[in-house]
Amino acid sequence: AYRFLWSHPTIIDSVWNSLLLAFASATIVMLLTSVVCWIVVKTRLPGRWLLDNIASLPLVFPGLVLGLAVMVFYLNFNIGIYGTLWIMLVVYVTRFMPYGMRYNSTSMLQIHKELEESAQMSGADWFTTFRRILLPLLKPGLLAGWIYVFIVSIRELSASILLYSPGNEVVSIVIWELWENGQFVELSALGVVFILALLALVMLAQYMGRRFGVKEI
């Protein structure tokens, strides 16, 4: 059964697709929400809290509903990403953005405004201040959020099942297909490997937490 896993091209491709999507979605989510959280927490722009509400809106919808909405939208507006990994990346980023907001907003609230003001008085522009002052201070929250989004992206199924196409399967889709086809021996083998991989990610998260001072992940 385990030899079947390593010799089956669809399974190998699904592993790479899952890793690529998880890495990209975690990175985009954490960087994008760090900017949104700065606007919400550190500025006095009118309606800034509306951004927080919009970013948290995907929590209201199940993944299946969100996937269906994205599918209908991109079928009506043919942009050329339907049936590719790009549309799955759009859904992943949208669905997991609320988690990035929670991690980043908690960290952003702990950064004193005086640090930004001191940088600005020294002649630093906004981008330099954000890159050299805020991002290093946000590192524990960014790291914790990145690992969490990476893990939940790896196991995402409900939205992916509506948006994948042949050749763009992810691991969760392959597990579902093995179940549907009655290949329970191969399913069990892949499930064991999948659980061990997730366990390794959790252990890595705990190590990184101790290494960089993240208390909870």
Model-derived regions: residue spans:
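Interhelical loop and adjacent transmembrane-helix boundary motif
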Residues: 1-10, 154, 160-206
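Transmembrane alpha-helix signature in integral membrane proteins
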Residues: 9-40, 47
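Membrane-embedded alpha-helices of multi-pass transport/permease systems
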Residues: 31-35, 68, 94-116, 154, ...
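C-terminal transmembrane helix and the adjacent membrane-cytosol boundary/short C-terminal tail
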Residues: 39-40, 47, 105-116, 120, ...
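Membrane-interfacial helix termini and adjacent extracytoplasmic/periplasmic loops
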Residues: 43, 47-51, 64-97, 127, ...
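Hydrophobic transmembrane alpha-helices
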Residues: 54-61, 87-97, 147-154, 164-166, ...
